[in-house]
Amino acid sequence: MSNNYHIAVLPGDGIGPEVMAQAYKILDAIRKRFNICITTSEYDVGGIAIDRHGCSLPAKTVAGCEQADAILFGSVGGPKWEHLPPAEQPERGALLPLRKHFKLFSNLRPARLYAGLEVFCPLRNDIAAKGFDILCVRELTGGIYFGQPKGREGQGKYERAFDTEVYHRFEIERIARIAFESARKRSNKVTSIDKANVLQSSVLWREVVTEIAKAYPDVEINHMYIDNATMQLIKDPSQFDVMLCSNIFGDILSDECAMITGSMGMLPSASLNEKGFGLYEPAGGSAPDIAGKGIANPIAQILSAALLLRYSLGHNDAANAIEQAVNYALEQGYRTTDLAGNGKAISTDEMGSTIARYIAEGV
């Protein structure tokens, strides 16, 4: 395993730069503790890139990302750029082209309820008390969002609209492998979500996932219909480890998983291609209303750095160290404003420094 890596850092807009500053602290602590050589280069993206370069994804940014082992992404967008045509706005003009350029076909969204944060979980107390730690693995480039034909035709009462759910065998195979490999780093359980009692695309999905599962005899596999899965997530989320989903089902379930954790400020996200190259970002937005106030929760950005170390750089030990430090900081009662309730809140900068210190101390 190489110990020399280069990361393209794209802080973006809103709270992006201030939470990214905390991720830098974490990477520095990881360098020192694990003797890993990690270098970084920073590039403009989103609204700030529009202001400086005239577009949300400059060619220099793309070229810099091509030279890196992974991308650590902040957040983009804000009211300042909402007057632009939709295709030119930061969100659509930056993230979607990056995903397409680097062929990022899989999205990984962890959702964990940390001890001490049960009060923020909207589920019943006895359910929240059990906790949960779920990884939603979503296929990003196939399915009904991209299938052809799609469109509208006709007039009057005969006007109709249509979309087409299409999945190729190779698309299902590669996302299934991501799910099973991820399960091996966790609790060795995959729940594949489909609607095989109605949809032909789901029949193929279930067949292919069942075939791929044979190569992972150490991983438990079970299948669940999407309607039942949405119910089971509310009834008992602790039953899930890795949830394997098509594009549209993953879109729905990953947001449901996010909501039951109680705070978007805790949720990282990873988008990967077949070579392990990935873009890592917080699941929340740029939060321009709190930008510059020093109150943003940096944990999602910090945990995104942990995912980067695990999935693109192959350093699961370093990723675990970050996650353990985050958990310990929360156990010790450290909270940013979004999680403080009636208690005392610490700043964005203080939270980053606290977690970095715990990494250095090896908690």
UniProtKB/Swiss-Prot annotation:
Q: Which keywords does UniProt give here?
A: Amino-acid biosynthesis, Branched-chain amino acid biosynthesis, Cytoplasm, Leucine biosynthesis, Magnesium, Manganese, Metal-binding, NAD, Oxidoreductase
Q: Which residues bind NAD(+)?
A: 78-91, 285-297
Q: Name one GO cellular component term.
A: cytosol
Q: Where is this site: Important for catalysis?
A: 145, 195
Primary subcellular site in the record, as a coarse category? cytoplasm
What pathway, per the record?
Amino-acid biosynthesis; L-leucine biosynthesis; L-leucine from 3-methyl-2-oxobutanoate: step 3/4
- Residues bound to Mg(2+): 227, 251, 255
> Which cofactors does the annotated protein need, by name?
Mg(2+); Mn(2+)
Query: What is this enzyme's catalytic activity, as reactions?
Result: (2R,3S)-3-isopropylmalate + NAD(+) = 4-methyl-2-oxopentanoate + CO2 + NADH
Mind telling me which Gene3D superfamilies this protein's record contains?
Isopropylmalate Dehydrogenase
User: What does the cofactor field's note say?
Assistant: Binds 1 Mg(2+) or Mn(2+) ion per subunit.
- GO biological process: one example: L-leucine biosynthetic process
Which residues participate in substrate binding? 99, 109, 138, 227
Q: Is Cytoplasm among the key words of this record?
A: yes
Q: What is its EC number?
A: 1.1.1.85
* InterPro entries, per database record: IsoCit/isopropylmalate_DH_CS, IsoPropMal-DH-like_dom, Isopropylmalate_DH
PROSITE patterns given for it?
IDH_IMDH
NCBIfam families, from UniProt?
Answer: leuB
Q: What's the stated role of this polypeptide?
A: Catalyzes the oxidation of 3-carboxy-2-hydroxy-4-methylpentanoate (3-isopropylmalate) to 3-carboxy-4-methyl-2-oxopentanoate. The product decarboxylates to 4-methyl-2 oxopentanoate.
**Quaternary arrangement and interactors, per the entry?**
Homodimer.
Name of the molecule in the record: 3-isopropylmalate dehydrogenase
What is this organism's lineage?
Answer: Bacteria, Pseudomonadati, Pseudomonadota, Gammaproteobacteria, Enterobacterales
